[in-house]
Design a protein with these regions (language model features):
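Extended ligand-binding clefts on enzyme/binding-domain cores
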Residues: 26, 33-47, 53, 131, ...
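Extended acidic/polar, glycine-enriched regions
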Residues: 1-28
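Acidic, glycine-anchored loop motifs typical of Ca2+
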Residues: 121-132
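Well-ordered alpha-helical scaffold segments within catalytic/enzyme domains
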Residues: 4, 89, 100-122, 139-149, ...
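Asp/Glu-centered strand-loop micro-motifs enriched in Gly/Pro and often flanked by an aromatic residue
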Residues: 1-2, 69-92
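Aromatic- and histidine-enriched alpha-helix N-cap/loop-to-helix transition segments
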Residues: 56, 62, 71, 90-101, ...
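Aromatic- and Gly/Pro-rich amphipathic surface segment
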Residues: 45-79
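Active-site lining segments of carbohydrate-active enzymes
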Residues: 82, 86, 154-230
């Protein structure tokens, strides 16, 4: 510490490794934003995502869909996981693609800046894989679920009906009229949804392009640690 007269600074450390783990600090935020399983709460949330929402003239409508399970006249897709967006519980492919890409790109540019203190689920304990790659993989797994294949691609989970109250994700009680299922919106180039809850997405190429570039970078960087997934 530094002492000047009667004034003392807090204790601080002088070391060649003082900045170790600084790059990993951002991952604390990413882990607490996780959907499906939250390592901070040690509990799961939104495990029933979700039922598909799309217009009748969208590519891959009822007559061509092959990936969903139909229960009680609902077209269901397994879309759990990923990250909650901002301070609500909506999820977007385009922002998740960007987040995952930047995690991967940061590791590619400076892999020695990242450490390994957490496992793939975000729980404490090293697993032999840099935490930044674990976090990126969490996002990549969700993005993979959002693109079952062909012309069938999804870009959003939930909508502004989410904005009712502050609550923990494990205590989310917002009802979209389908029990525990939340709506999953298709990429169509047109806004999807109901009345004032209709989303504003008109992108197709931008979402697909970000998806392709993120997946390509993920495949490149995960070849060593997870070749089967890559």
């Amino acid at each position: 510490k530094i002492i000047v007269g009667k004034t003392e600074s807090p204790n601080f450390r002088i070391s060649d490794t003082i900045y170790n783990s600084t790059a990993d600090y951002l991952l604390y935020y990413m882990r607490q934003q996780r959907c499906g399983y939250n390592p901070y709460l040690k509990d799961s949330c939104h495990t029933h995502d979700g039922f598909t929402v799309y217009s009748e003239d969208a590519p891959g409508n009822d007559s061509t869909q092959t990936s969903e399970l139909i229960i009680n006249n609902l077209y269901l897709i397994v879309a759990k996981g990923g990250w909650h967006d901002a301070s609500d519980y909506l999820q977007y492919a385009t922002t998740s693609e960007t987040a995952a890409y930047h995690l991967l790109f940061a590791y590619k540019k400076n892999p020695k800046a990242f450490g390994d203190w957490f496992d793939r689920n975000g729980d404490p304990g090293a697993n032999g894989i840099p935490d930044v790659l674990d976090e990126a993989r969490w996002g990549l797994e969700w993005l993979d679920r959002m693109y079952p294949g062909g012309e069938e691609m999804y870009q959003q989970i939930a909508d502004d009906r989410d904005h009712q109250m502050f609550r923990l994700p494990t205590e989310d009680s917002v009802n979209y009229g389908k029990g525990l299922y939340r709506p999953v919106y298709r990429v169509t180039g047109k806004p999807q949804g109901l009345m004032k809850y209709k989303n504003r997405s008109t992108g197709v190429a931008s979402i697909a392009g970000k998806f392709a570039s993120t997946m390509a970078l993920g495949s490149e960087l995960l070849q060593k640690t997870d070749p089967e997934f890559a």
